[in-house]
């Protein structure tokens, strides 16, 4: 309803997802809620014909350790992360990249943050190679560091 009313960006957050301890009990509570909410959102977008116009992004700033710590949790792990992207006219129903068997290191098609950003900007009709925003000093800053290309697998 917010999007249909003209809102350009909607951000939702629930729970902490920072389970350094009691990981399994926390996920038993939170994961079904995320699953049900995302399913309802994506179904609703399809029913309203908005699935090509709206990008859904579920993403954290880092992954979690492949090993459980002493407090039955997982700590920060920047080597590997995951994201869920849907809608926005992107190709769906695929997994891009792979890790080793423990989920500790990227082994196939590592994806950089900038590639995901470039993909989202491209889906929004924004060219990240030429679009800049002024920083607090008035200097132009590109939207994506390193001028990384959008992910060809998604577009």
PLM features: what roles do these ranges have?
Residues 1-155:
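Ligand-binding pockets and gating/stacking loops
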């Amino acid at each position: 309803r917010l999007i249909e009313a003209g809102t350009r960006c909607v951000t939702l957050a629930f729970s902490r997802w920072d389970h350094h301890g009691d990981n399994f009990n926390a996920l038993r509570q939170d994961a079904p809620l995320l699953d049900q909410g995302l399913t309802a959102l994506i179904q609703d977008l399809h029913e309203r014909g908005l699935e090509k116009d709206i990008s859904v992004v579920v993403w954290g700033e880092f992954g979690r350790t492949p090993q459980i710590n002493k407090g039955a949790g997982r700590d920060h792990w920047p080597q590997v992360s995951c994201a869920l992207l849907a809608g926005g006219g992107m190709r769906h129903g695929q997994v891009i990249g792979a890790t080793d068997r423990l989920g500790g290191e990227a082994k196939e098609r590592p994806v950089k943050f900038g590639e995901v950003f470039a993909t989202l900007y491209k889906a929004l009709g924004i060219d990240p190679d030429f679009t800049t925003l002024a920083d607090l000093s008035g200097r132009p800053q590109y939207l994506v560091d390193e001028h990384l290309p959008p992910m060809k697998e998604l577009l």
